[in-house]
Amino acid sequence: MANLRITLVKSLIGRPETERKTARAMGLKKLHRQVVCPDTPVTRGQVQKLAHLVRVESIE
């Protein structure tokens, strides 16, 4: 199963609470921090919600 490397590239300051909570749930706390998550529908939904704030790379 593939994984996704997700990097927070824009600040969460001034963002709605739901976006901040989603980023926090994914483990993204500070700018330019990376997390590796499994490529599941749940993760894809979270990435879609934060698409304007994160960079996503597929890794194997």
From Swiss-Prot:
CDD domains linked: Ribosomal_L30
Protein name: Large ribosomal subunit protein uL30
The entry's keywords: Ribonucleoprotein, Ribosomal protein
Disulfide-linked positions: none
Organism from which the protein derives: Moorella thermoacetica (strain ATCC 39073 / JCM 9320)
Domain of life: Bacteria
HAMAP family in alphabetical order: Ribosomal_uL30_B
Protein encoded by which gene: rpmD
A cellular-component GO term for this protein: cytosolic large ribosomal subunit
Annotated GO MF terms: structural constituent of ribosome
Oligomer and partners: Part of the 50S ribosomal subunit.
Annotated PANTHER family: LARGE RIBOSOMAL SUBUNIT PROTEIN UL30M, MITOCHONDRIAL RIBOSOMAL PROTEIN L30
Ribonucleoprotein found in the keyword field: yes
Family in the record: Belongs to the universal ribosomal protein uL30 family.
